């Protein structure tokens, strides 16, 4: 990939950029962000919607995303009290930026499974000395 000088972060920001890109590289964070695309959701709704995530991991991810300014946490003072999570403006732009990646993943899942199976079959076949 060709880059121009404007594509590169300033020298001191390179490490900080990597830290921010950890959000994009984390599967749980992207899946949580995706679930918030249509508006605020409660913890239990997110837990049901994000297949395979544990309660602890979801709690950690929500706190991390809130800390990074990707989402907001709102406590509703009703009976019974509950909490909802929603994307911030910045979170919305993250959702827009990563939506094509998630769509690509879904579109190519079967081909990736086939490639892995073919690779694993070759790896299990002994080679001649």
Predicted regions and their residues:
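C-terminal regulatory/oligomerization modules of transcriptional regulators
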Residues: 1-12, 67, 72, 86-129
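Residue-level detector of alpha-helical recognition elements and their boundaries
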Residues: 35, 47, 61, 73, ...
